[in-house]
């Protein structure tokens, strides 16, 4: 009887563990120019479970790439990152973000120009907002600039819409362009 109870308890623990682990994942959303590049740079960080290219910040529901790139929807190309905070902190994701954008350029990023390529950190809650502001202040200090010189916008998270399938994992699916 004890052996059966122990076996049953072990099975229940094994079955419930992945659900608990999945429930502990957190989400961050970053816009920083072309989502292909941002997705590629963030998804390989230890502790990041997945990164999805998409759109955030605009008014239109279920926007398409064509609509967003027309610069009429208010959306930015963005990446939604699901991460394990026991393996990588939101602050570490922010440090990676700042290394992958030009924080002094609010008109797009690098060769990608326009509102849909504007750098934005979308914050999900007060803790993320405080961490994002602290990271912006640190980035400004590191650059020797006043905080007001940074053009990365910090905004409350808007609805995130995944981009079309051909945009997902673009760097891996087009390795000739990304090696």
Task: Describe the predicted segments one by one.
Residues 18-20:
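Short, intrinsically disordered, low-complexity terminal segments
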Residues 22-179:
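Flexible coil/turn and secondary-structure edge motifs
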Residues 1-2:
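N-terminal secretory signal peptides that target proteins for export/translocation
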Residues 5-16:
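Bacterial N-terminal signal peptides
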């Amino acid at each position: 009887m004890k052996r059966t109870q122990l076996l049953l308890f072990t099975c229940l623990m094994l079955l419930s563990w992945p659900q608990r682990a999945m429930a502990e994942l957190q989400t961050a959303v970053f816009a920083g120019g072309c989502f292909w590049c941002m997705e590629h740079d963030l998804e390989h960080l230890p502790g990041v479970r997945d990164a999805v290219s998409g759109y955030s910040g605009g008014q239109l529901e279920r926007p398409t790439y064509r609509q967003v790139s027309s610069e009429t929807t208010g959306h930015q190309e963005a990446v939604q990152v699901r991460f394990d905070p026991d393996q990588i902190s939101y602050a570490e994701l922010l440090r990676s973000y700042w290394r992958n954008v030009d924080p002094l350029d609010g008109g797009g990023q690098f060769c990608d120009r326009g509102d849909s390529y504007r750098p934005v950190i979308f914050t999900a809650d007060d803790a993320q907002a405080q961490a994002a502001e602290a990271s912006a202040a640190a980035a400004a200090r590191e650059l020797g600039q006043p905080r007001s010189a940074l053009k990365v916008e910090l905004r409350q998270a808007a609805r995130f819409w995944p981009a079309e399938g051909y945009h997902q994992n673009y760097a891996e699916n087009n390795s000739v362009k990304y090696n």
